[in-house]
Curated annotation (Swiss-Prot):
The keyword Ribonucleoprotein applies. It comes from the Bacteria. HAMAP family: Ribosomal_uS19. One of its GO terms (biological process) is ribosomal small subunit assembly. PANTHER family: RIBOSOMAL PROTEIN S19P FAMILY MEMBER, SMALL RIBOSOMAL SUBUNIT PROTEIN US19M. This is Small ribosomal subunit protein uS19. Protein S19 forms a complex with S13 that binds strongly to the 16S ribosomal RNA. The lineage of its organism: Bacteria, Bacillati, Actinomycetota, Actinomycetes, Micrococcales. It comes from Arthrobacter sp. (strain FB24).
Length: 93
C-alpha cells in the first residue's frame, strides 16, 4: 500500500539539508548517505548520491524518471553469482 498523498514524500532531514546546501552553492558534489528509505524529490535532480548497500556506497545519478522512487531501489544489496552448473561428466556408473 503506497504512502498517503496528504503526508507527502519522506526524506531524512540530514539528507535534505545536504541537498539544499548543494543547491544553494550551485555545486554538484557527491552526497554520501545511508538513508535508503528516503524518496527522491525534484530538488535532487542532477545530483549524484552515493547510497550505502551494506558494504560500500553506490553512486546514483538522479534523473527525472527516478522522482518518486526510493534511493534504495537503485543500490542492490545482494550480488547474484549465478547457479552452479551440473557436473554430469564427473559422475560415472
Amino acid at each position: 500500500m503506497p504512502r498517503s498523498l496528504k503526508k507527502g514524500p519522506f526524506v531524512d532531514q540530514h539528507l535534505f539539508v545536504k541537498v539544499d546546501r548543494e543547491n544553494e552553492k550551485g555545486t554538484k558534489n557527491v552526497i554520501k548517505t545511508w538513508s535508503r528509505r528516503s524518496m527522491i524529490i525534484p530538488d535532487m535532480l542532477g545530483h549524484t548520491i552515493a547510497v550505502h548497500d551494506g558494504r560500500k556506497h553506490i553512486p546514483v545519478f538522479v534523473t527525472e524518471s527516478m522522482v518518486g522512487h526510493k534511493l534504495g531501489e537503485f543500490a542492490p544489496t545482494r550480488t547474484f553469482r549465478g547457479h552452479v552448473k551440473d557436473d554430469r561428466k564427473g559422475k560415472r556408473r
